[in-house]
Regions:
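Short, structured beta-strand/loop micro-motifs enriched in basic residues and often containing a Trp
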Residues: 43-44
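Charge-rich, well-structured scaffold segments of protease-associated domains
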Residues: 2-36, 55, 110-267, 276-277, ...
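Functionally critical, cavity-lining and gating residues within the transmembrane helices
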Residues: 315
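Active-site glycine/GP-rich loop and adjacent strand/helix microenvironment
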Residues: 273
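N-terminal signal-anchor transmembrane helix
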Residues: 52-54, 62
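Active/ligand-binding-proximal structured segments within catalytic/core domains
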Residues: 59, 66-117, 298-310, 318-322
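Short, small/polar residue-rich loop motifs at catalytic or cofactor-binding pockets
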Residues: 47-50
Length: 472
């Protein structure tokens, strides 16, 4: 069966069993609606108190974190490939391939895969983002070898026996997504910010590509991208590092490549743009955003604090002013995204037509305020405790630990201990946050996107944010 992932920014997941594994690429509107913390995929630095890393001759990197106090294991097989690595003729192949990993291998049928995982009491899932694909599971520590064998077989041995039926499933997922403007508007914003660059494409891809792409093209993409240098095996829980390394040697045998095949061009951004899609919706779904920082930028800790203050928590300025004081929205908040060589800062609000001018007026006022003045002492202190609390609570989940160490090694980000991470957050200064607010929350640098019934009213509502957007 298939279900949407929770995501703050589209990382698309296919649900196969119980959805209690940490979603490696969280979501835009779900987190914005709950206004929990940093938008996933955003600046969530990696925590690793006892992580060990080993690189195999095949180029695969194995990273583990032992948590002896638990009786479970979270295992993830990460691949450094996603929608950014596709050509327009391949739009959506990464996500389509992720679905097909569950649909049969040389040794197991789709039904057998489901039955084996059920028999192990495992929760299994997968997710695709713009720069990564992840196949992951949680299971009892007594089933580590069986789960490892099956996951690795799925990752590297798909035979595509059910491609026609799964093609229809993905087309239905795309159709479902078209009916979810609160999610789709973030893809509209990405196109406005990144233009024709691959980061501007949506992870789900295009229906015309999915309906026609042949098996040989999918298999060629799989063979080109699912290579040793692109794969990370990550495990957290009641495990032994050497045992996971040995299982990786025995079960994960991808083609060997000299490099991970990265040939990305950084996006050349053209300044603030406006993108609108007409749809007869009850609300105006509006997203604003502009260039951010890349994932290796040391300013990511300060940006996490800034995001928490501006719209990433229930005490944030946007949540307080738009929702709590005025009741103008149910879902409102901010988020950040970091990629290999670029990033995005964004915000979202969903509001009825009668409220759109007032809501955008408040957003424009808050943008101008934080851009000019930064944040105050109370906000800085509260945001630090908020972010640290989330990090500590998250570190108690083996699935979250696996996700963090896996992403860190996949993207060559230093592994930090929890204490080191907390020190990074504590060290953030007013000046750092103010500089980021000045650089990235300048109203004139933000693009605007909307899915709504009335373009003229949307554009006129943008005047308090940036008058130039009204006629852009």
């Amino acid at each position: 069966m298939s279900a949407p992932a929770t995501r703050v920014r589209p990382a698309v997941a296919v649900m196969v069993a119980v959805a209690d594994a940490a979603d490696p690429g969280a979501s835009a509107t779900a987190a914005v609606a709950a206004v929990s913390a940093t938008a996933a995929g955003a600046a969530e630095p990696e925590v690793a108190d006892h992580a060990q890393v080993t690189e195999l001759d095949s180029g695969i990197r194995v990273v583990t974190e032992a948590v002896p106090s638990v009786r479970s294991v979270a295992l993830g097989l990460w691949v450094r490939t996603g929608s950014r690595d596709e050509t327009p003729a391949q739009a959506g192949v990464s996500h389509f391939l992720e679905h097909l990993l569950f649909k049969g291998t040389k040794r197991y049928s789709a039904i057998e895969i489901a039955e084996i995982f059920d028999g192990l009491g495992a929760a299994v899932n997968a997710a695709t983002g713009k720069e990564s694909t992840n196949l992951y599971a949680r299971f009892l520590d007594t089933h580590t070898e069986e789960a490892f064998d099956l996951l690795s077989e799925m990752l590297l041995g798909p035979t595509y026996p059910e491609i026609d039926s799964e093609r229809e499933v993905v087309l239905e997922e795309i159709a479902m997504y078209e009916d979810e403007p609160q999610d789709k508007v973030h893809d509209v914003l990405d196109r406005a910010v990144f233009g024709g660059h691959p980061l501007g494409r949506r992870v789900l891809g295009e229906a015309d590509v999915i309906s026609s792409i042949p098996v040989p093209d999918i298999d060629a993409y799989h063979r080109a991208r699912y290579t040793g240098a692109n794969i990370v095996v990550a495990a957290a829980g009641n495990i032994d590092h050497d045992a996971i390394v040995e299982l990786s040697r025995r079960h994960v045998e991808p083609p060997v490549a000299d490099s991970n095949g990265e040939s990305h061009d950084a996006p050349d951004l053209d300044g603030a743009q406006v993108a609108f899609q007409q749809k007869d919706t009850e609300q105006f779904h509006i997203a604003l955003g502009g260039p951010g920082i890349d994932r290796a930028d040391e300013r990511r800790y300060a940006l996490t604090i800034l995001d928490a203050v501006f719209g990433g928590s229930t005490s944030s300025r946007l949540f307080r002013e738009v929702r709590e004081k005025k009741g103008l929205a149910y879902a409102v908040g901010s988020y950040t995204q970091q990629y290999a060589d670029s990033g995005l800062v964004g915000l979202y609000v969903g509001t009825r037509e009668d409220n759109v001018e007032e809501a955008c007026g408040i957003i424009g006022r808050e943008l101008a305020s934080i851009h000019a003045d930064g944040i105050n002492d109370d906000e800085l202190a509260r945001a630090k405790e908020h972010v640290k609390g989330r990090m500590v609570l998250s570190s108690e989940s083996t699935a979250a630990r696996m996700g963090r160490i896996g992403k860190a090694v996949l993207f060559d980000i230093p592994l930090l201990t929890l204490d080191e991470l907390l020190e990074k957050i504590d060290a953030v200064t007013h000046e750092e946050v103010a500089e980021l607010a000045h650089d990235f929350y300048a109203p004139e640098s933000l693009s605007a996107a909307a899915i709504a019934p009335n373009e003229e009213r949307f554009r006129s509502a943008l005047a308090p944010v940036n008058e130039a957007l009204v006629a852009a």
